[in-house]
Design a protein with these regions (language model features):
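Active-site helix of classical SDR
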Residues: 128, 165
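Residue(s) in the substrate-gating loop at a strand-loop-helix junction
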Residues: 149
């Protein structure tokens, strides 16, 4: 992945961190995006993204932090701007940002539903929208990966909001893969079983 530039949302911990460290080890320059909040999406901070950047740089890689929320259009655009300002281009986007607000459907609030859909599905849409536009200007294709879940494919008790969002990502990927073919943009989804 030498000379490739990757943006990874939700890269301050867990699977996103693993993606960031792996891509950096393989030679990519990485934008580590993370709002730095709790698992339920509350709060924010810079230490999570900064910690992953420090790990990458200490291992000899290239990385910069971005602390924006994927749910905000201006912040999603800023992720692409951060990549281009730091590394001159974009090549790879991994939509990994996510939160959990698990509750059985009969007890779920509208706010719990909306928050999860907003981060997982709208967040992936906004990040992809700006990344896609940058790829079209570059004219060299690119790669997009969506982090889904088996909860979106086979279900999991107490995760109607999360399952719906993750199933939505799989559908989003399928259509983007069709539309991206003529531009050399490959789109895939990962559905890990946790």
């Amino acid at each position: 992945l030498d000379n490739k530039v990757a943006i990874i949302t939700g890269a301050g911990g867990g699977l996103g961190r693993a993606h960031a460290l792996l891509l950096a080890r393989e030679g990519a320059a990485v934008v580590v995006n993370d709002l730095g909040g709790a698992r339920d999406g509350t709060g924010s901070g810079q230490s999570m993204a900064d910690g992953v950047v420090d790990e990458i740089v200490a291992a000899g890689g290239k990385a910069v932090a971005n602390y924006g929320s994927v749910t905000d259009d201006t912040s999603a655009q800023a992720m692409v701007t951060t990549a281009k300002d730091a590394f001159g281009r974009v090549d790879i986007l991994i939509n990994n940002a996510g939160i959990l607000r698990d509750r059985s459907f009969k007890n779920m609030t509208d706010a719990e539903w909306d928050a999860v859909i907003d981060v997982h599905l709208r967040g992936a849409y906004l990040a992809t929208k700006h990344f896609w536009a940058a790829l079209l200007v570059q004219g060299e294709g690119g790669r997009i990966v969506m982090t889904s879940s088996t909860s979106g494919l086979i279900g999991n008790f107490g995760q109607t909001n999360y399952g719906a969002a993750k199933a939505g990502l799989a559908g989003f990927m399928r259509v983007l893969a069709l539309e991206g073919m003529k531009y050399g943009i490959t789109v895939n989804v990962l559905a890990p079983a946790a």
